[in-house]
Amino acid sequence: MNVWTALVIRVNRAAVVGETVTLPCWTPLTTPVDWCYLQSESAERAWFLCSAGNIVSDYRERFTLNISVPGDYSLVIHNVTRGDAGLYICREDIGLGTEHQIALTVHGKISISSSCVIRLYQVTK
């Protein structure tokens, strides 16, 4: 009896609202990958973002694949929103091999005031 198991690589990523974030996915094969998204690990519904190496039309505005290097199918999310937080899974289209799981956390922007004044006093006796 043959049992196939996939290697699972789990990565945590953090991004700030409005930034661009890259979620890594590498495969030694030239087989296209599927990317799916779950809002949480216990979610009952998954959204397909990419099927057979093509971004699904609903997501093409902000999501791209980094396919400039053979084997690199990293997902790039532009203008990250809080709604993008969740679990992203990349796996080879044939269903064997490595599965990449990326847990994305999104933080709000931090604003820093530029009107800070520092005064130094010299005390002499």
Where in this protein do the model-derived segments appear?
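N-terminal Sec-dependent signal peptide, specifically the hydrophobic helical h-region
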Residues: 1-13
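Short, solvent-exposed loop/edge segments of extracellular or virion-exposed proteins
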Residues: 14, 114-120
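Solvent-exposed loop/turn motifs of extracellular immunoglobulin-like beta-sandwich domains
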Residues: 15-24, 68-72, 78-90, 123-124
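Disulfide-bonded cysteines in secreted/extracellular proteins and peptides
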Residues: 25, 35-36, 50, 75, ...
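N-terminal V-set
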Residues: 27-62
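Extracellular/luminal immunoglobulin-like beta-sandwich modules
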Residues: 32, 83, 87-110
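Exposed loop/turn and edge beta-strand positions of beta-sandwich/beta-sheet ligand-binding modules
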Residues: 59, 71, 98
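A broadly used, surface-exposed interaction patch
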Residues: 59-66, 75
